[in-house]
């Protein structure tokens, strides 16, 4: 059956011939902890991917149709750096940066346009940062304010088959804000604002015959607000 995504114009079809994918990973981590919750960690990792499931594209009556297919195998290797630091009393900065290299081996005689490429859905660069202010007022009352930034590098959104180029989601920046206030040990208030920047989500498709890319779709998810009130027994 077909279903329509909440965002974007593609229709999605399942694949009853899919097999489970498996991954086997090794990682090595160094961590250092300081006072006031300060922390630094560096992680290196390697993953072997057996029959990874990837999103692919096809054409059906001129409409955009996406489905899923197993690749033969693949690998992912990268490094991740994370730190937390108290700047002044009640004000804390945290950040995370990762770089990842991926490669996929495709089935012999398959219809994939690019015979060697990165793993679908994997961004080579990911970054997150947050600035948090959390003062206390007495024993029970506390204010929590946080500004959160995310960077997601360009990644393959749907794999090209039958001479169709790969569709790539372009680099995306997002900024969120959250606020919370504990009135006492029972009552608390919360405000969440997602995607303050409301940037366009842009997709471009490779044109194999010319080696260029053309924009095929863009949309905005919009900025949304959540207000909550909670009670703890």
Describe every region a protein language model picked out:
Residues 1-26, 36, 44-69, 148-162, ...:
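Surface-exposed extracellular loop regions of Gram-negative outer-membrane beta-barrel proteins
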Residues 9-14, 54-55, 65-69, 93, ...:
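Glycine-rich loops and low-complexity Gly/Arg-rich segments
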Residues 15, 25-31, 39-41, 68, ...:
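Membrane-embedded beta-strand positions in outer-membrane beta-barrel channels/transporters
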Residues 21, 33-35, 74, 86, ...:
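A short, compositionally biased micro-patch
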Residues 21, 25-26, 118-233:
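Conserved C-terminal beta-signal and adjacent last beta-strands/turns
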Residues 45-48, 67-158:
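Gram-negative outer-membrane beta-barrel transporters
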